A protein has these predicted regions:
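N-terminal beta1-alpha1-beta2 submodule of the flavodoxin-like/Rossmannoid cofactor-binding fold
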Residues: 2, 9-104
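Short amphipathic alpha-helical "recognition" segments used for binding
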Residues: 7, 11, 24, 169, ...
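FMN-binding flavodoxin-like domain, especially the glycine-rich phosphate-binding loop
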Residues: 77-179
Length: 179
């Protein structure tokens, strides 16, 4: 075997090894909307935590607000995803009135687009507990509308415990391997 043959063999092994690693990668998609920055903060910290804790994953963040702002068309998801939804409602108390979603409706439109609803593992709701019955009400409404579960909830920007809880749920849904 010549020196050139040996180098070609190394390149082939490296190429095959990288293809093998790509095949094992699991794509995790986090679909969300953030208006005040709270949900953006949570999803960004969740992505970092997932990448630190689990092997062979690629975490994709899809911010619906950016799609709408840039005039991009909705698209069909090719893989399962988890939706994150803050609560914005018209006044009221969430029982007798004040249960009409405002500002976050593009998330519902995205989920309803094509076959996206069937690919959604579920929704993680966020809000402010000061609003009592309205806390995460939109996530509960989406659960009823689309037939998927409310996986978890967090208040405001969420705490590390919330990140860990949601990460554990995602790890189970995607069958992830810890590092």
């Amino acid at each position: 075997m010549t020196k050139d043959d040996y180098q070609d063999t190394i390149l082939v092994v490296i190429f095959l090894d990288s293809r093998k690693r790509e095949e094992k990668m699991k794509k995790i998609s986090l679909v969300y909307i953030s208006l005040s920055g709270n949900t953006e903060s949570f999803v960004t910290r969740l992505k970092a935590y997932l990448l630190e804790q689990y092997a062979n994953i690629d975490v994709e963040k899809i911010h619906i607000k950016d799609l709408v702002k840039e005039g991009e068309d909705f698209f069909e998801m090719t893989n399962p995803y988890v939706a994150f939804l803050p609560t914005y409602l018209e006044g009221g108390n969430g029982v007798d009135n004040g249960d009409v979603e405002i500002l976050t409706t593009p998330v519902g439109d995205f989920i309803a687009y094509g076959d996206n609803a069937s690919k959604c593992f579920g929704v993680v709701g966020s809000g402010n507990r000061n609003f009592n019955n309205q806390y995460c009400l939109t996530a509960k409404q989406y659960s009823q509308r689309f037939g998927f579960p409310v996986l978890a909830d967090f208040e405001m920007r969420g705490m590390l415990g919330d990140i860990k809880k949601v990460a554990a749920i995602i790890a189970e849904l995607y069958e992830l391997e810890s590092l």
